[in-house]
């Protein structure tokens, strides 16, 4: 069954949920019909247990159960699943968060289906120069 949404949000990791929470809350308060997709990129229960309760957000509408193999296989899996989902779940806008594999895969699927992509990074920086992944 086909359904049109005002927006689709795709998340895959705990930091994505943290970044998506304020937007999801805003969409719900303003009755913006949103499809909320969790790719399942992080399967570790400690990374996702209680996240919905902690952030006071609803659980995702769809869980893709992405395999925990390597990044290439994850990307291919997510692109394939989202391409199929986007055939029956339409929206002009797809939102992605952060810079994880799920973000890349959702961007590819969004482009494949000629939908508009928006990206939220949210500028999270610790300014701790000992964290090698965050150097500016």
Feature map (PLM): residue ranges:
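N-terminal subdomain of nucleotide-sugar transferases
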Residues: 1-41
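Structural motif
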Residues: 6, 10, 37, 92-93, 96-97, 120
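Conserved nucleotide-sugar phosphate-binding/catalytic loop shared by glycosyltransferases and other
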Residues: 32-74, 81
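Short, well-structured alpha-helical segments in soluble
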Residues: 79-89
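An aromatic- and histidine-rich active-site surface loop
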Residues: 95-112
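A short, histidine- and acid-enriched strand-loop-helix "catalytic/donor-clamping" loop
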Residues: 117-132
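Conserved small/polar residues in nucleotide/adenosyl-binding loops
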Residues: 134-136
């Amino acid at each position: 069954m086909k359904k049109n949404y005002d927006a689709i949000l795709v998340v895959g990791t705990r930091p994505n949920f943290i970044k998506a929470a304020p937007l999801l809350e805003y969409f719900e308060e303003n009755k913006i019909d949103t499809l909320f997709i969790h790719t399942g990129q992080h399967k570790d229960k400690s990374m996702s247990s209680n996240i919905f309760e902690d952030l006071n957000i609803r659980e995702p509408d769809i869980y893709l159960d992405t395999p925990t193999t390597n990044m290439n296989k994850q990307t291919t899996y997510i692109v394939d699943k989202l391409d199929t989902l986007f055939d029956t779940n339409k929206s002009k806008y797809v939102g992605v968060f952060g810079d994880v594999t799920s973000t890349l895969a959702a961007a590819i699927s969004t482009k494949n289906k000629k939908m508009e992509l928006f990206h939220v990074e949210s500028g999270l920086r610790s300014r701790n120069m000992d964290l090698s992944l965050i150097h500016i």
